[in-house]
Amino acid sequence: MKSTGGSDAAKRRAGETAADTVDDGMIVGLGTGSTTAYAIETLGRAVDDGLNIIGVPTSFGARQRAIDCGIPLRGLDEVDGIDLAIDGADQLVGDTGVCLKGGGAAHSREKLVASAAAELHLVVDDTKLTERLDQPVPLAVLPDAHTVVAETVRGQGGEPTLRAAANKDGPVVTDNGNLVCDVDFGAIEEPAALATQLSSIPGVVEHGLFVDDVTAVSIGRPDGVSTMTY
């Protein structure tokens, strides 16, 4: 399900812009995905030049990239808080900052890091902008619960699909050992209400709706970048 649209130049501009807001001494949440990767690489170069930061990765992939870039890391339980988290999104309503995440199956840890952060700065290219969220909502589910969860969301008007792995037989398994169920609700008119509804389903570890977490977003375009705050 992971979206790979958008130009590399646009993604790079967004990632670099967010990384440039990081100050010396900050604890920084490091998100997952192709656009956030540019932010991590930019921070790595800044660390080489003397910037003093600590990174808190949201996934195995983010951790490995940060290590490769020379960024000192700690786990979420090893810090008192996070000053700023930088992460991507699969869809974003620009007017409100409501977004959909989970194409990389890391949304459970991403939401944990976002909840611990004083600020969440999203980085996206302009292909991720939409007036209304309408992509399937990723649910991280306990392996034994996926059938029950699927039946429940069908009763709520969703069409669930267990996400299949691309390079192995069987389903995608998250870093935390959960499965991912992508649920198509069509156009989502009330994301906050849907988020509450999904959170109440037994067996759902986390959903990919981020309703009121975002404080800023940098939007990369082929010819520039713009930043909005919320």
Residue ranges of model-derived segments:
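N-terminal active-site beta-alpha-beta segment that forms phosphate/nucleotide-binding
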Residues: M1-Q91
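Conserved phosphate- and dinucleotide-binding cores of soluble alpha/beta proteins
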Residues: K2, F60-Y230
